């Protein structure tokens, strides 16, 4: 019970200011719009964007958004709270599962690393499909690996089915190595997966026919992997810096992969082999986005926690290095908003907010030096939590102003009846404008209209 306090400490961090920035990027407004339409129409089979079928993703996230709206949460909260709560529930499961399989100190360290890594926290705060898929897939993977009871195969399979409903067929590819080592549970896992994943796919295919498979499977799965048509092409090595950045502030622990003792346990060796397999798979794809490799972070946290536990007296150096990373948080928090608003060359140098993090880093350093490794780990964890609070408080207003269209639309909503959108407006802002307008804003076609245009990276309203 005492170890669950770790999760209780995370609840305020994960729910803090979720509604502060408006919906951002092209994905959040689209997914929130589809969930809103599902809640209004009570059609939970065919996803619709602006009343037209939309087969880019399966429905789990849309169902979650619809549930948020059903309990009358505001727009951004309805979209993001279900994802944050799923992340917290997974972290509790992660902690308890590892505590039953490894020493409790390893379970606590792995959960602390994952729960405060920048990548996991970031994707727990936005309404996109990456976090639900990563959490559900990892839960299926851990049950398949660590629970020897044959009937738990149904649970692992059902969770894998939910992961498929979160992000289509990628979880099947990732699960293949786990399936191959789970000899006693293969049939039960297949049964559990089919029971959960097949009904929606069958119903949406019956209702929509060939257009569903053409878009959902051939375009979004096959073409996304093999062709550059979706315009997210990146080099083969792209995910190495993405993963290292996603680990912040625990990035220095990646050096533990160079230590032989990290591989003392067969379970860890399998996880490392699985991560290599998954990394090669994602790297081979033509289209790459940072969130694709989110499923690697839980396994990575386990390996790093185990490796840290095997470092002995040298553990202090690894914790000291992670503690020092906290010093960068104020610079990130101070520089990121200005970078978003005015460009990197005008980002300010602000030193005073860094003092508390220097103190925390110094405390972690001192505790590690005194061989108080558990307290040093707790100091880094606590500093990361405080730093992430600080980062959210400092950056969310800038995200709302610079990346979301919510404030712009609220300021000009009185002109909505005659508003049109110029061709110059980028697609992510179009989706956001359509979401907050609750309709598709038409393209500009003649005089007498109030035109939304983009000038120097900002939206402006012009009367023609």
Regions found by a protein language model. Name each.
Residues 150, 154, 259-464:
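Membrane-embedded architecture of ER/inner-membrane glycosylation machinery
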Residues 1-315:
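Membrane-integral, polyisoprenol-dependent glycosyltransferases
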């Amino acid at each position: 019970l005492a170890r669950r306090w770790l999760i209780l400490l995370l609840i305020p961090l994960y729910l803090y200011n979720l509604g502060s920035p408006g919906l951002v990027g092209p994905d959040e407004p689209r997914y929130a719009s589809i969930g809103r339409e599902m809640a209004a129409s009570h059609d939970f089979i065919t996803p619709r964007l602006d009343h037209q079928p939309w087969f880019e993703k399966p429905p789990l996230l849309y169902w979650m958004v619809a549930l948020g709206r059903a309990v009358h949460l505001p727009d951004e909260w309805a979209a993001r709270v279900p994802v944050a709560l799923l992340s917290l529930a997974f972290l509790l499961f992660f902690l308890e599962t590892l505590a039953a399989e490894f020493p409790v100190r390893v379970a606590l360290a792995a959960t602390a690393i994952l729960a405060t890594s920048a990548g996991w926290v970031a994707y727990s705060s936005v309404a996109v499909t990456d976090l639900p898929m990563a959490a559900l897939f990892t839960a299926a993977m851990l049950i398949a690996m660590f629970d020897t009871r044959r009937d738990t195969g149904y649970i692992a399979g059902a969770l894998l089915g939910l992961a498929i409903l979160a992000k289509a067929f990628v979880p099947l590819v990732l699960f293949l190595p786990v399936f191959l080592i789970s000899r006693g549970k293969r049939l039960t896992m297949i049964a559990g997966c089919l029971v959960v994943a097949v009904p929606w796919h069958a119903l949406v295919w019956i209702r929509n026919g060939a257009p569903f498979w053409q878009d959902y499977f051939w375009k979004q799965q096959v073409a996304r992997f093999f062709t550059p048509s979706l315009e997210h092409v990146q080099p083969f090595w792209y995910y190495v810096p993405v993963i290292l950045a996603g680990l912040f502030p625990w990035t220095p622990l990646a050096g533990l992969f160079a230590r032989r003792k990290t591989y003392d346990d067969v379970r860890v060796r399998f996880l490392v082999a699985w991560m290599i397999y998954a990394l090669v798979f994602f790297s081979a794809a033509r289209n790459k986005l940072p969130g694709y490799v989110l499923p690697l972070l839980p396994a990575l946290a386990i390996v790093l926690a185990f490796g840290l536990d095997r470092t002995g007296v040298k553990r202090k150096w690894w914790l000291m290095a992670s503690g020092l990373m906290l010093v960068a948080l104020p610079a990130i928090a101070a520089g990121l908003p200005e970078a978003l608003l005015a460009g990197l060359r005008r980002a300010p140098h602000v030193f005073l907010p860094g003092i508390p993090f220097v103190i925390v880093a110094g405390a972690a350093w001192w505790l590690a030096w005194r061989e108080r490794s558990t307290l040093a780990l707790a100091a880094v964890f606590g500093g990361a939590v405080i730093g992430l609070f600080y980062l959210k408080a400092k950056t969310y207003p800038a995200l709302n102003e610079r990346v979301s269209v919510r404030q712009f639309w609220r300021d000009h909503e009185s002109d909505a009846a005659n508003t049109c959108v110029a061709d110059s407006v980028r697609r992510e802002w179009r989706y956001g404008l359509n979401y907050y307008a609750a309709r598709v804003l038409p393209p500009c076609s003649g005089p007498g209209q109030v035109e939304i245009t983009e000038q120097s990276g900002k939206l402006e309203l012009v009367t023609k």
